[in-house]
Regions:
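An amphipathic, basic-hydrophobic alpha-helix
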Residues: 56-59, 64-89, 99-107
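Alpha-helix initiation/capping motif
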Residues: 70, 94, 111-112
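Structural detector of well-ordered beta-strand residues that form the stable sheet scaffold
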Residues: 38, 61, 91, 114-115
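Structural motif
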Residues: 2, 29-32, 82, 105
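Short helix-capping segments at alpha-helix termini
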Residues: 31-35, 85-86, 107-110
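N-terminal strand-loop element at the rim of the active site
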Residues: 4-5, 9-72
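Short His-centered aromatic/hydrophobic patch
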Residues: 92-98, 117
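Active-site proximal beta-strand in glycosyltransferases
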Residues: 7, 89, 105-118
């Protein structure tokens, strides 16, 4: 059997808000043999859904707080995508700041990007 497609979900953190709960409902009900969600968060601490994500086979990565004007943030984001070429689909839930993340993802070879404002 082939490896599942890994979709990177970009969020602030995985607390119990509406966006996070919606993503978890999708994640619980998709065929994880075909599609697997991983999460790029913008907080260091662990949140409500982290244990469940890991139990379902997802990975959680942490970056500094999203700041499009910070050279440190942009460098960390660029480094992440250079080191994680396994992602060809990035689904970003950062409202108007999704463009910052998706531009860096595209620059690093991500083929499919989705900007989703909730």
């Amino acid at each position: 059997m082939s490896e599942p497609i890994r979709v990177l979900q970009v969020v602030t953190y995985m607390g119990r808000g509406g966006l996070e709960t919606m993503l978890m409902n999708y994640y619980r009900n998709i065929d994880r043999d075909k599609v697997q969600f991983d999460f790029l968060t913008h907080r260091d601490e662990r949140w409500d859904y982290d244990d469940e994500i890991e139990s379902l086979g997802g990975k959680i990565y942490h970056l500094p707080k999203l700041n499009p004007f910070s050279k440190n943030y942009l460098n960390a984001l660029d480094k992440f995508f250079k080191e994680h070429k396994e992602y060809q689909i990035v689904h970003c839930h950062q409202d108007c700041l999704s463009g910052v993340v998706l531009k860096v993802a595209t620059k690093n070879g991500v083929r499919f990007t989705i900007a989703h404002s909730h």
